[in-house]
Amino acid sequence: VEWMAQGQIANPRSSFAPQIRQAVEDGYRRLLAPSIERELRAESTAACDEHAISTFSRNLRQLLLQPPLKGRTVLGVDPGFRTGCKVAVVDATGKHLGGATIYPHEPQRRWDEAKATLHGLLAEHGATVIAIGNGTASRETERLAAEVIAEAADPQGLAYVMVSEAGASVYSASELARAEFPDLDVSMRGAVSIGRRLQDPLAELVKID
């Protein structure tokens, strides 16, 4: 403000100098500064929007171009703490074969029981891949899957994969999901969707409204 005032005051000793300085200060604080702030904010917002769009586009491209996993029976897991982990097995065509709800994490901590259930489902349906949703409790569930695979009779024939569960809850509550799985609750439909996303990501993602 002082620098701007000096540019407007020809004679600092003039009796009008204080009034000119006051006018410059008022003009800056009331008019110029807010305008500059709005312009900078608009530029920053535009840059952030452009970066967000670029990041979203890149992530979406990677998601849509994921190669399908054909010919494998998959055990899909929708992780959770208090409400448990929903588990659904789908065959190579995406047909739901069976499932269960396990409670390996807090507060129930029924870890061994959960492992036994997973061992049983893998053996019963011949599933060779565990697809784990990457949301809440995913890291804890990843450790569970790793233990189950390590304890399996043929650990080399099993694997687990982290799968993006973005939009799974939207699909599971949709009319399409209800029509396809009228006998399954919402969370179990989500586990089916997670398993299918590994088998054919594009075919499953297009169902999200």
Regions found by a protein language model. Name each.
Residues 1-73, 92, 115-120, 124:
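Extended, highly charged clamp/arch subdomains and adjacent linkers
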Residues 51-64, 70-73, 77, 82-209:
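Phosphate- and other anionic-substrate recognition elements at nucleic-acid/protein interfaces
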